[in-house]
C-alpha cells in the first residue's frame, strides 16, 4: 500500500483548525497536557537555537569563500542586495499598510507573559542554552570567515558534519513536532478567548504579502531587463514554470532543474546558468525574507510593540546573512531566523510559534518568489560576465 505523504503546510493548517475546534470543549485538565508539551518543546527550541545558528551559519560562510572567484563574489553580493532590498521594501510597505488593517494593543500584548492569561503547564523543565544567540552569531561569523581563509580541511569537515547533525535535528525532531506545538498554542489561545483576532490577522497579512511578492518580482525583473537590455515581462513570463514548480515542491533546491532550463530560455549562457542557479537556490531568499519581515511586523503591531526603522534595519541586514544558512527543507528559513527574532526583536517562545505558523502558511509562494528571482539574478550575472 502506497504511503500517503502530507505536506507540512497541510499539517499546520490541520493543527490550527484542530486547536481552535478542540479549544471550544476540551476540559482544562486535558488541555494542560498539551500546554505542558508546549513548555517542554519551547524550552528545547530555545536550547537548540544557538546550536542551529552555529551549525548552519559557520559552514555556510566558510563554503562561500572556498574557491572564491570574482563571479562568485559578484553573485553573492547581488543575492544579498536583493534579499536586503526585499526586507526594506517589505518594511516600508508594511509600515504604510499594517497600522490601518491590524488592531493594536490587543490581548496579544499579554503574550509577553502568557501564564498571566493562559493555561499553565503541569511542570516545567529548564533547558538553558549553551550560549546566548548573539554569542552564537559572533562565533559563527568568526569561525566561518576563518574557514574561508585557510587551506586546512579538518575543522571545515567537522563543521560540515555538525551541519548534517543540525539538519537531521530540524528534519527529524523539530519539524515533525511543530504541528503539535502549533496545535497546543491555538488550543491555549482558544481557551483564553483571543484566537479569532489571530486568525483574522493571519488572513490579512497573507493577502498583503501575496501582493507585495508580485510587486517584488516585477521590480527584480524590471531591473534585470534594464541591465540586460531585454523585455522584463517576457523574462518574467519565461520563469513562470519555475514559479509553478516551486509552489508544489516548496523547495528551491528541488526546483533547480526547472529554474535552470528557464534561465537558459531567457538567453543566459548555460555555463553561467549552471553556476548561478544552484548558488542562488542556496543564498538568495528574497521571498522568505519578505515573509519573515512582514510577519514579524504584524505580530509586533498586534502586540502593541513599537515598529521602528531603527530596530528593523539591523534585523533586516542580519536576516540577509542568516538566510544564506537556511537549510533547504520546508520551514528551514524560519528555523534559521528564530535566533535573531529572539535576540534582536525580543520574540518569546509563544510569539516564535505564531511566526512559524504564519510563515509556513505561506511557504509555497515564498519559495516560488525565491526561485523566480533567481532567474533575474542569472540574467544580470550573465550580462556582467560578458564574453569571458
Feature locations, PLM:
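Juxtamembrane helix-boundary/capping and inter-helix hinge elements in multi-pass membrane proteins
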Residues: 27, 60-70, 148-153, 161, ...
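Membrane-interface alpha-helices at helix entry/exit sites of multi-pass transporters
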Residues: 69-75, 168, 172-175, 265-281, ...
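Signature of multi-pass transmembrane helix bundles
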Residues: 2-26, 39-48, 70-234
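Transmembrane helix-bundle signature of multi-pass membrane transporters/permeases
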Residues: 40, 44, 57-58, 75-80, ...
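Membrane-water interface of transmembrane alpha-helices in multipass transporters/channels
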Residues: 33, 69, 73, 195-203, ...
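Short amphipathic alpha-helical coupling elements at transmembrane boundaries
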Residues: 32-46, 157-172, 237-245, 261-265, ...
Amino acid at each position: 500500500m502506497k504511503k500517503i505523504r502530507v505536506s507540512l503546510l497541510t499539517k499546520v493548517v490541520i493543527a490550527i483548525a484542530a486547536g481552535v475546534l478542540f479549544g471550544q470543549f476540551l476540559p482544562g485538565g486535558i488541555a494542560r497536557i498539551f500546554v505542558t508539551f508546549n513548555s517542554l518543546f519551547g524550552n528545547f527550541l530555545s536550547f537548540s537555537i544557538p546550536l542551529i545558528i552555529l551549525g548552519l551559519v559557520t559552514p555556510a560562510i566558510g563554503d562561500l569563500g572556498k574557491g572564491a572567484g570574482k563571479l562568485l563574489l559578484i553573485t553573492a553580493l547581488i543575492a544579498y542586495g536583493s534579499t536586503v532590498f526585499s526586507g526594506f521594501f517589505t518594511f516600508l510597505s508594511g509600515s504604510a499598510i499594517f497600522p490601518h488593517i491590524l488592531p493594536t494593543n490587543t490581548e496579544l500584548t499579554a503574550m509577553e507573559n502568557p501564564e498571566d492569561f493562559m493555561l499553565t503547564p503541569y511542570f516545567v523543565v529548564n533547558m538553558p542554552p549553551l550560549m546566548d544567540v548573539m554569542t552564537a552569531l559572533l562565533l559563527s561569523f568568526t569561525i566561518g570567515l576563518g574557514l574561508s581563509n585557510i587551506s586546512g580541511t579538518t575543522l571545515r569537515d567537522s563543521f560540515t558534519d555538525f551541519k548534517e547533525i543540525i539538519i537531521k535535528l530540524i528534519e527529524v525532531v523539530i519539524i515533525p513536532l511543530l504541528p503539535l506545538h502549533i496545535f497546543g498554542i491555538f488550543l491555549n489561545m482558544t481557551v483564553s478567548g483571543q484566537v479569532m483576532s489571530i486568525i483574522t490577522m493571519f488572513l490579512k497579512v497573507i493577502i498583503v504579502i501575496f501582493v507585495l511578492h508580485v510587486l517584488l518580482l516585477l521590480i527584480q525583473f524590471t531591473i534585470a531587463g534594464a541591465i540586460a537590455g531585454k523585455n522584463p515581462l517576457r523574462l518574467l513570463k519565461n520563469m513562470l514554470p519555475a514559479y509553478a514548480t516551486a509552489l508544489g515542491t516548496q523547495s528551491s533546491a528541488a526546483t533547480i532543474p526547472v529554474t535552470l532550463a528557464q534561465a537558459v530560455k531567457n538567453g543566459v549562457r548555460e555555463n553561467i546558468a549552471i553556476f548561478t542557479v544552484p548558488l542562488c537556490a542556496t543564498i538568495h531568499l528574497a521571498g522568505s525574507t519578505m515573509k519573515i519581515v512582514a510577519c514579524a511586523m504584524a505580530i509586533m503591531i498586534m502586540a502593541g510593540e513599537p515598529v521602528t526603522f531603527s530596530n528593523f534595519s539591523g534585523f533586516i541586514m542580519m536576516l540577509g546573512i542568516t538566510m544564506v544558512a537556511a537549510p533547504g527543507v520546508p520551514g528551514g528559513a524560519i528555523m534559521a531566523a528564530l535566533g535573531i527574532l529572539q535576540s534582536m526583536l525580543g520574540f518569546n517562545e509563544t510569539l516564535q510559534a505564531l511566526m512559524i505558523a504564519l510563515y509556513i502558511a505561506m511557504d509555497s509562494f515564498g519559495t516560488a518568489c525565491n526561485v523566480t528571482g533567481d532567474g533575474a539574478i542569472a540574467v544580470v550575472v550573465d550580462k556582467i560576465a560578458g564574453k569571458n
